[in-house]
Amino acid sequence: MALDFLAGCAGGVAGVLVGHPFDTVKVRLQVQSVEKPQYRGTLHCFKSIIKQESVLGLYKGLGSPLMGLTFINALVFGVQGNTLRALGHDSPLNQFLAGAAAGAIQCVICCPMELAKTRLQLQDAGPARTYKGSLDCLAQIYGHEGLRGVNRGMVSTLLRETPSFGVYFLTYDALTRALGCEPGDRLLVPKLLLAGGTSGIVSWLSTYPVDVVKSRLQADGLRGAPRYRGILDCVHQSYRAEGWRVFTRGLASTLLRAFPVNAATFATVTVVLTYARGEEAGPEGEAVPAAPAGPALAQPSSL
């Protein structure tokens, strides 16, 4: 279990490094003003950030997801696996329930982590910046708003993570079965990458409008007086001002991110397990990867 956990953490780091620039673009598109939009779309946002802030601008807020990575993987792996065993048998419904339980519990870390990430991603470059880093951001929020401020957006995070993790594990299980992902298959890695990437896309599509609301709530008040009184008020104001399309803002960037993030995660997990388990090689010298580790460790929504 410790080895699987280590491999999952390594895969998660790879996924964060690959996907964070897309996440920065997504957040900026989600929260920009409709009256005076700064970006015309995903590609324009990428170009503008690089031009104005260099490539490093795409990695603003990176420290927060990296810091929370180990704890999130520990929670997801432990809760999903134990829940599935407690339910007694492996079925599509139980895969969904186990994934949903894992998604709900990891919100304790995911919500503050994403709050800091969002604030840093929206912070202007230069000496006048408000936050020095992820820890400083959370410390300042706690100092001004207390524990409630650190957990801003918790309900919307729960509404996003709980069903999306359920959908992810359900989809991943169905795809790995359909593709015939078995230990010893020389096409195992490409199949896992395809299953993981596709599952990530499906899970994001299932709850993306909630993610838009969460981002707006967590960014609210950063550049002026707070606008929203809660989730329903945010939905109402956003829809009234911008129509239903507001709930798809940043979707292209998110879907572009979803597949490579999961591909990087699964490739890294497979490589780590292959080398680390060399002592467990079969009679022909081929390392036997642990198929169940992949779906339990990879999570598409937070990292």
Swiss-Prot record:
Reactions it catalyzes: L-lysine(out) + L-arginine(in) = L-lysine(in) + L-arginine(out); L-histidine(out) + L-arginine(in) = L-histidine(in) + L-arginine(out); L-ornithine(in) + L-arginine(out) = L-ornithine(out) + L-arginine(in); L-homoarginine(in) + L-arginine(out) = L-homoarginine(out) + L-arginine(in)
Region (Disordered): 282-303
Name the UniProt record assigns to this protein: Mitochondrial basic amino acids transporter
Transmembrane segments: 2-22, 61-81, 96-116, 153-172, 187-207, 255-275
Keywords: Amino-acid transport, Membrane, Mitochondrion, Mitochondrion inner membrane, Repeat, Transmembrane, Transmembrane helix, Transport
Source organism (scientific name): Homo sapiens (Human)
Stored InterPro entries: Mit_carrier (IPR002067), Mitochondrial_Carrier (IPR050567), Mitochondrial_sb/sol_carrier (IPR018108), Mt_carrier_dom_sf (IPR023395)
One BP annotation, GO: mitochondrial L-ornithine transmembrane transport
Family: Belongs to the mitochondrial carrier (TC 2.A.29) family.
Cellular component, GO, one term: mitochondrial inner membrane
Higher taxonomy: Eukaryota, Metazoa, Chordata, Craniata, Vertebrata
